[in-house]
Amino acid sequence: QLRIAAAEAESLKFGRLPCFAAGEAAGSLRCAVLAKKLCELCGGAPGIGSVVEFFDEYQQNKPLTTREIQLLPAMLRRAELEILYGIVCTSGDGPLGTGRAAALQNVLAALSRIDDADFSECIQNLNIPRRRLADAADFSASDESTQQLYLKAAAEISERTSASEQTVVRKAFELSKGRTGRRALVGCSLLAEGKPELIRALRAEKKRLKGLKNDHGAKAPSDSGKRTDVQKHKCVKLSNSAKCALLTVFEALLAAALLVPAAAAAGRLGSAFFPANSGGSAWFTVLTVIFGLMPALSAAFAIEARLMPVFKKPRPLPRLSLRGGIGEENRTLVAVPVLITSEKSVRQAAETLEAHYLAAQDFAAANCGAEFAILADFPDSTEKTKQGEAELIELAKKLIDDLNSRFCAGGRPVFHYLHRERVFNSADGVYMGRERKRGAVEALLDCAADGDTHEFCCNYPDICSEKERFRFLVVLDADTIMPNGALRRLIGAAAHPLNLPVFENGAARPSFGFSIIAPRMAATSRSAAESGFAALISGESGMCAYSVRVSDFNWDVFEEGNFGGKGIINIDAFLRSVSGKIPENTVLSHDLAEGCFARAAYAADIVLYDGEPSALLPWQKRRHRWLRGDMQLLPFLFPPLNSGIDAVSRRKILFNIRAAFGGISFAAAFLL
């Protein structure tokens, strides 16, 4: 019990808690005093009903804060431990009397009841800001973690403005009245671009009501009435362009601090090796700067990424709960692009589709609103069609029929097989699927948006047979594993009103919201265990734009993520942002560019799993493909392709190009 109490005491550090201003309990935490009073009245651990009744009555005049209510179980445990301490101290070393023994038994039973009790519903019922927020559609439709985001935001604004949480929520509702779009959402004032306006409104109201009593009815645990630093100074929100400039300067200074001593040491080493040659020292210094620049920048970024969480806490992405299923308004297609080379590859693709379907069964009995498709191509060939390929397509259709008969008999088909025919590519001199994976996804987006199926030689069963069009497209690789619940969370994030893309003044890039939401990618334990090499690279975080470390950093700092090819796409918004922006036969690695044009978010709390190469050669081929693709993004920094590329996107592209030479630079610096 003492260990539990000590752990709970740590939670007291995350915020200021009101204390009583006068009386016998002056200076004591209000929630702790009230919890002890309740335990004394009940003669032991109070039941959930007693807790609700007691604190409801108290809150008629003096509402508790969200933090106080969340700490009620901890305060009740603390109160019982104080009672236990009093019993032990008064008994001394002698035997316990009958009365004290009974009291001790009651306290121990009370501690056990507190451990076993479920306070979640009690905490929800007692939270007055939560009751008020329940009237907001965006709050009530959100999942529990997102609702906690709203409540935490209200508590932080309350601390910052010295207004009560009830006042913060009331003012957020007032600001949302009579508005349309995002600004009609209460969450916009609490979590998004409406927050500065809310803070200004609360401070203006505070000036008008100066001299009235604090809504909490309790003073803050400070010795004076002086305002804190965060209240004295207005918080200036930097633009992403300013953040990029500051980070670039900071990285340059860090790299210089690391590189200058190394260059000086190299110069002295050169003088020692070539004492007769006056240029030896200079050459050693120049070579050290050239080959040490990339390692120094890598180290600077590593330091920067390590320090950033200290200054800026990551903000999770809001999500809908989707308690009743996806619904037709959020109709989603899950697509797996594959290369069909044999009968085995067809069967593996069907098995992958079945696994994704089964992983989605946690939130909808018939998975209403979500469908699954194999997006297939044949390998490049000197011929438009080859012998045996028609049989592979027929096998795929048979397997799709089998899946539909097993999982959706009598209903509309949920599984589909789409296959593109080869077209001649004059640049490569072969027949191939247009633009490979990018072209396949682009064709599927057109099909899902307006029923255009002209690129597909096989569309079985017809994916456009329903009047309703798909709203979202989830793209996964053939070796991607989607855990149970991941699809629901992805769709919930994409469908949340605060994440829906908003285009202002006819722009092609969203000003608010996101066209793509990319999950966190991790290596599967099976692929990591295949070889020592796979185990070694499965945990790499490095400087590549597709790595977890870089994705976390970009999201925490710029509130934009990196798209690595897996994620959920808002179909209409993506087509508006990306269509016509990437010329054909120019880009091999297109995911980063698409994320830049369409504005991608990063859902760090939604994890999908991917396989890793088990040997050096496949890994090196993948790195070589990524390197070529990254270098092909260089033209997007200049006209005419840079339309829609902002400062953050330029930083991402330059970062990847810089990281592409990291391995060579590290090796050269090591040899030097």
Segments from the language model and where they lie:
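Internal catalytic domains of large membrane-associated glycosyltransferases
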Residues: 96-238, 242, 315-643
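ATP/Mg2+ or Mg2+-diphosphate-binding catalytic cores
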Residues: 1-8, 60, 87-102
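Active-site acidic catalytic loop and adjacent metal/ATP-binding pocket
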Residues: 1-45, 49, 472-474, 480-485
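Alpha-helical bilayer-embedded segments of polytopic membrane proteins, i.e.
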Residues: 73-87, 234-304, 519-523, 563, ...
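Active-site activation/catalytic loop segments of kinase-like enzymes and analogous catalytic loops
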Residues: 24-69, 76-92
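Conserved helix-loop functional segments at active or binding sites
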Residues: 4-15, 40, 44, 60, ...
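Short helix-terminus and kink motifs of transmembrane alpha helices
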Residues: 48-52, 297, 301-305, 488, ...
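Transmembrane-cytosolic junction motif
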Residues: 302-319
